[in-house]
């Protein structure tokens, strides 16, 4: 706690250009402490082992190679249950008790928005939060210590809905959304796409994080006789809504989800219920049997190391963590958050899961590509090439 308190109390002195001897919180001669908060007990818990293990795999590789600049990584994982209030408790422990150097790969739009400003104000790097980037950035007042990698949900939903309208000519469009940052931001993109076509929602229905019954929301769409349902959903909600559509025998409606619902875990858990689902997203959906040979080898190594099945979320968490490890390496022995931030701002990064080499433009991932996929025969199948 002492280093974190020193940072808070001396922030004004440092900002004034007066040198201090305080070291970075979470950094000792032999160790760098990283933290994250994930949904370990809530509606998205089934997908969290992939994110946690993907991170741990890359950190273990760095540690097995002797560490970075003489230091090894230690990862502390806390539960946010997809609830902002749980995230507040988690971040308090990570900052005060564990004194983490950085928060990496934290999950959830609402949980991240609830705590990001507290973290950066106390000098912790906040890297690659999984959630609504523009809302998280706004909450953090565009802090130089925040680096967002999740594409802007409004932008990608605008592109995805526009493509669906142009391709399938739906007469009526409905929107089912999670109340909070996720649904609000995705909804902005949906409304923009509809307005450009002279359209508006034929029906809309919200749900709360943690809800498991979506019969009333789907019934509202059915009553409005929509041709396309756009859903702002994560894992369980995506499957639940599709299951309701199938139960009604509603075969002539199309359903489009965004990045959080366009995942391999949705296929594993949803099975036949998600057949025909459309998804719009911004990274490649590799499987253990698809992709280039290095990716196949990575999946095989993951399966040897962990008990759960690997998916693209594990690979994505690994790729993000790899970027962070490289930035720590590039920052040098005298490690500070500012030096890591400078490295991230001035270098580019590549990985097979990304559609292109990535940079941080204004501390946000750039460029943002979008691809439309559909579940066919139990697998995500590309319908488009990556689009900007």
Residue spans for each PLM region:
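Signal peptide-proximal N-terminal region
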Residues: 27-29, 53-75, 195-199
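Hydrophobic alpha-helical segments within soluble ligand-binding/sensing domains
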Residues: 87, 148-172, 213-215, 238, ...
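Short, low-complexity disordered leader/linker segments with a strong preference
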Residues: 1-33, 386-388
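Extracellular/periplasmic periplasmic-binding protein-like sensory domains
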Residues: 245-318, 330, 381-387
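Segments of small-molecule ligand-sensing domains
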Residues: 304-314, 325-379
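Beta-alpha junction/loop-to-helix N-cap segments that form part of ligand/metal-binding clefts
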Residues: 33, 46-53, 65-139, 207-214, ...
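Extracytoplasmic ligand/sensor domains, especially the bilobed periplasmic-binding protein
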Residues: 99-203, 254-278
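Extracytoplasmic "Venus flytrap"
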Residues: 27, 31-56, 78-85, 107-108, ...
């Amino acid at each position: 706690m002492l280093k974190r308190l020193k940072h808070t109390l001396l922030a004004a002195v440092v900002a004034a250009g007066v040198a201090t001897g305080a070291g970075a919180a979470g950094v000792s001669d032999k160790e760098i402490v990283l933290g994250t908060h994930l949904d370990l007990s809530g509606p998205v818990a089934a997908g969290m082992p992939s994110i946690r293990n993907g991170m741990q795999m890359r950190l273990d590789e760095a540690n097995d190679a002797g560490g970075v600049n003489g230091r090894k990584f230690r990862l502390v994982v806390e539960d946010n249950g997809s609830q902002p209030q749980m995230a507040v408790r988690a971040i308090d422990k990570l900052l005060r008790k564990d004194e983490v150097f950085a928060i990496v790969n934290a999950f959830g739009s609402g949980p991240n928005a609830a705590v990001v400003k507290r973290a950066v104000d106390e000098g912790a790097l906040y890297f690659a939060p999984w959630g609504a980037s523009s809302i998280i950035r706004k909450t953090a007042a565009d802090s130089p210590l925040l680096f967002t990698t999740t594409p802007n949900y409004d932008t990608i939903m605008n592109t995805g809905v526009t493509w669906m309208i142009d391709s399938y000519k739906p007469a009526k469009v409905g929107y089912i959304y999670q109340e909070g940052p996720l649904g609000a931001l995705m909804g902005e993109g949906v409304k923009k796409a509809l307005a450009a076509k002279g359209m508006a929602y034929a029906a809309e229905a919200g749900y709360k994080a943690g809800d498991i019954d979506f019969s009333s929301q789907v019934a509202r769409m059915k009553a409005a006789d929509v041709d396309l349902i756009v859903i702002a959903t994560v894992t369980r909600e995506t499957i639940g809504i599709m299951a309701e559509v199938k139960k009604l025998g509603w075969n002539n409606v199309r359903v489009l989800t965004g990045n959080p619902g366009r995942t391999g875990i949705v296929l594993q858990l949803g099975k036949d219920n998600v057949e025909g689902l459309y998804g719009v997203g911004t990274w490649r959906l590799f499987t253990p049997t698809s992709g280039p040979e290095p990716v196949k080898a990575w999946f095989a190594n993951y399966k040897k190391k962990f008990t759960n099945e690997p998916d693209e979320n594990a690979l994505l968490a690994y790729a993000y963590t790899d970027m962070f490890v490289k930035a720590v390496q590039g920052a040098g022995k005298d490690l500070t958050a500012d030096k890591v931030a400078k490295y991230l701002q001035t270098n580019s990064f590549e990985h097979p899961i990304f559609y292109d080499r990535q940079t941080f433009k204004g501390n946000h991932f750039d460029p943002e590509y979008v691809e439309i996929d559909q579940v066919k025969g139990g697998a995500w199948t590309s319908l488009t090439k990556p689009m900007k």
